[in-house]
Amino acid sequence: MQFLAWFNMLLLLPCFSTTKTCFPGCHCEVESFGLFDSFSLTKVDCSGIGSHIVPVPIPLDTSYLDLSSNKLETINESMLTGPGYTTLVSLDLSYNNIAKISSTTFSRLRYLESLDLSHNSLEVLPEDCFSSSPLGDIDLSNNKLLDIALDVFASKGQGKPLNVDLSNNMLSKITRNHEKSIPNIQNLNLSGNRLTSVPNLQGIPLRYLNLDGNPLAKIEKGDFKGLKGLIHLSLSGLHDFRELSPYSFKELPALQVLDLSNNPNLRSLTAEVIFGLNSIQELNLSGTGVSSLPKTVLKYLPSLKSITLRKNIQCFKTIKEGQYHRQIGLTKLGLGAEELLWCKTPCPRPVCRCRDKPLQSAPQNLPTP
């Protein structure tokens, strides 16, 4: 049995061989698998050569093709057709000047799992442009998209879990046709856009959502309705952000990580605001105006493990066991008879000195309402 397990492991181990003959200017690397190199795939790097490169002939067993930084202005189906393209698993078209794609551009890439179109000039995404491929990762960051219908990411089949990066575009509107199939998006990055309100994402099986750096002034009750599976929400650095309405996060029972950092105009966090966050483990309030917490914070956040306050002051939940003594560098938040939050205050001296000699002044208590 041990020999069989060892043999099977060897079959799975990749073995990198030397480069092979490739199109002039490109670099081809063969990745072999199996004990006797019985299976191989080729990675083709044709980046930075120039727009004349397409269409480029590639080996039959090509799995990865890099066409980035070639000043490409157009890309169509005919450029991605031919021997070798049918086996593509990953395609990199980043850092070009692509302004337009059609609904059939990627239609023949039946095995494509990763597509990078970041740092281009795309303004519109046509319907069904990604539906023919079993994509798991789509990077559309740093384009010029103004609005988008999330149906464009729906697969004709069941669809595998999908990561979509739409950061640093010009998006002010996110829509979805509820009569069409639900895109299986689990990770969605909308940071650095022009969203003035939380888009309606109801029904999408999101687990990670990033809205950092948008001009959101407030978060209201019901903004996250229908996102019961969300476990990570980032709302950092929102322009002019001032208010969290009561029960803003009530619809997020599975949320484990909430990042509200770098919102200096956020001054308070009431019990009504954090109500319903029964699964939250990490709460980041660094760089905000929040300097106090409700005394009942642990009652409303039963799963909490740590909170970060002010300038990276980290607080950790501990259980009080009998008598205890004040620890150097720690501040107590009195938040219940048995459960306490101990906060590590930044050391005013180099770490080595703090270890050699206790601090002269006791840390101040963080105020509680």
UniProtKB/Swiss-Prot annotation:
Carbohydrate attachment residues: 76, 189, 284
Residues covered by the LRRNT domain: 20-60
Gene Ontology BP annotations: bone growth; energy homeostasis; growth plate cartilage chondrocyte development; primitive streak formation
SMART domains the UniProt entry points to: LRR_TYP
Positions annotated as LRR repeat: 61-81, 87-108, 111-132, 134-155, 161-181, 184-205, 206-226, 229-248, 254-276, 279-300, 303-323
Keyword Glycoprotein: yes
Pfam families in the cross-refs: LRR_1 (PF00560), LRR_8 (PF13855)
Locations listed in the record: Secreted
GO cellular component: extracellular matrix; extracellular space
Tissue occurrence: During embryonic development, expressed in the middle primitive streak and Hensen's node. Expressed in the peripheral region of the developing eye. Expressed in the presomitic mesoderm during somitogenesis in a NOTCH-dependent manner.
Superkingdom of origin organism: Eukaryota
PROSITE patterns: LRR (PS51450)
Changes after translation: N-glycosylated.
Entries under InterPro entries matching the protein: Leu-rich_rpt (IPR001611), Leu-rich_rpt_typical-subtyp (IPR003591), LRR_dom_sf (IPR032675)
Record's keyword terms, sorted: Developmental protein, Glycoprotein, Leucine-rich repeat, Repeat, Secreted, Signal
Principal subcellular localisation of the protein: secreted
GO molecular function, one term: BMP binding
Signal peptide feature range: 1-19
Subunit structure: Forms a ternary complex with chordin/CHRD and BMP4.
Cited function: Contributes to various developmental events through its interactions with multiple signaling pathways. Dorsalizing factor involved in the induction of Hensen's node by inhibiting bone morphogenetic proteins during gastrulation and by enhancing DVR1/VG1 activity. Wnt signaling inhibitor which competes with WNT2B for binding to Wnt receptor FZD4 and represses WNT2B-dependent development of the peripheral eye.
Additional remark text: This factor is named 'Tsukushi' because its expression pattern in chick embryos is similar to the shape of the Japanese horsetail plant, tsukushi.
Name of protein: Tsukushi
Native organism: Gallus gallus (Chicken)
